Amino acid sequence: MSKWDSNIPFLFFSNKKITMIKECQNPPHFRVVTDNTALLEVCNLAQQKSAVALDTEFMRVSTYFPKLGLIQLYDGEHVSLIDPLAITDFSPFVALLANPKVLKILHSCSEDLLVFLQEFDQLPRPMIDTQIMARFLGLGTSAGLAKLAQQYLNVEIDKGATRTNWIKRPLSDIQLQYAAGDVWYLLPLYHILEKELAKTPWEQAVRDDCELVLAKTHKLQERDSEKAYLDIPNAWKLNPLELSRLRVLAQWRQNVAIERDLALSYIVKSEHLWKVAKNNPRNTSEMLEMGLTENEVRVRGKEILQLLSQARRISSNDYPKSIERISEDPRYKKTIRLLQEKVNSLTPEGLTPEIVASKRTLEELIKWVWKYDCSQDKRPELLIGWRKPIGEKLVDALK
C-alpha cells in the first residue's frame, strides 16, 4: 500500500512531517473493567495524561433518573469500558473527573453531564465538547460524531447499537465494539479540531460555551419542584386560580417521580395534569370524562382529589402570577425582527448568526430588559462570555 493511499487519514504538522493516525489503522481494542482494583489501575494511568475521551451509555425509558449502563474512557493508549453495575468504589473515577490537570473530552455532552452529576455528584472539569468545537469551525450547530469522524478521519462509525439495552448483562460484542468506538475516534478527532481551531480567534469562545453547558447542568439538577408547573405545556393559558392547582399537582408529581424513580408521564401525563387544574374535577368519574386514563384514575385518582381539596384552601393572595408570554406583547414581533437583523449585522466573520444568538436567547434578553430585572445571577446568556460585547449592543438597541 502506498503511504499516500487516500483511504488512510493523516495529520499534517507545520514541520511538513506526516503522521498516520493509529486509531484509523485498527478497530478499537479495549478492556472491560468490572472490579474496583482494575478501575483504580485504569484511573491512575489516565491521571498521567493531559487529555482523555469520555462517553456514557445509559437508559431512560420508564425512570426519572437515567440508568447508567457503561462508561467509556480512552487515554490515548487504552480504551476501558467501565461497568457501573459491577463496581462499588468509584472514587478513583470521581478524582479523575475533578482533576484540573486532565482535560476531559466529550461529544454532545449535555446528557452525559447529567449522568455524571447524578451518579457521582461531580462534573468533568476541565471539559471540552467536540460538537461545540465543530460549531465554531463552520460544521453546523449540532454535528454528530459519526459525521465528523467521516469527514476528518475517513472512518464510518456503526451506530447500530445506539438504541440497545445497556443495563442488560452480558453486553454483546457488538455493543462493546460500538461503545469503544465512540471514544477511540473521539480523541484523535479532538486533536484535529484543536489544530483547526487554533487557526481561528474562537478558542476562548469554545471554552466559554463549554462552561455554559456545565453551568446549565447544575441548574437542571437544582430544579425547584415548586416551579415544576412552569414546565407543563400550555400552563400560560391558565388563570392564577387554575395555576394554583397546577402548582400543587406538578410539585406532587415531581416529588413522587423522584422518590419512586418513575418517569413523570408514568404518574400522570402532563396534558392530563393540565386538564385537572383547568377543570377542577370533584370525583374520579369527572376525571375519566376529561380524558385521564383508567390506570391514572385507579392508581392516582384519590390522591389527586385530595390535592385539589388542599388547593382550594390556598388564599388568593398566594396564587401564582399569570404566566407572561413574551410573544403576546404587542412590541414583540417588531422587536424580535429588529434583534435578528442586528445579530445578522453583528455576527463576526466565520460564524453564523445561529451560533451568536438563537430565538430563545434573544427572547431571554428581551425579557431581561423589559422587566428591568438586572440582577447579576439572572444575566442572560447574551451578556455572558464572548457574546457579551454583542449582547450589550443588542441591549442598546432595545432601549
From Swiss-Prot:
User: InterPro entries of this UniProt entry?
Assistant: 3'-5'_exonuclease_dom, HRDC-like_sf, HRDC_dom, HRDC_dom_sf, RNase_D, RNase_D-like, RNAseD_HRDC_C, RNaseH-like_sf
Q: Which reaction does it catalyse?
A: Exonucleolytic cleavage that removes extra residues from the 3'-terminus of tRNA to produce 5'-mononucleotides
Give all residue intervals belonging to the HRDC domain.
239-318
- Please state every residue range assigned to the domain named 3'-5' exonuclease: 31-197
Its primary localisation, in coarse terms, equals cytoplasm
Organism of provenance:
Haemophilus influenzae (strain ATCC 51907 / DSM 11121 / KW20 / Rd)
- Offer an example of a GO molecular function term for this protein: nucleic acid binding
**Keywords assigned:** Cytoplasm, Exonuclease, Hydrolase, Nuclease, tRNA processing
Report the family membership: Belongs to the RNase D family.
* Protein known as: Ribonuclease D
Q: Name one GO biological process term.
A: tRNA 3'-end processing
| Enzyme Commission designation | 3.1.13.5
Cite the NCBIfam families for this sequence.
rnd (TIGR01388)
Q: Where are the transmembrane segments?
A: none
Gene Ontology terms: cellular component: cytoplasm
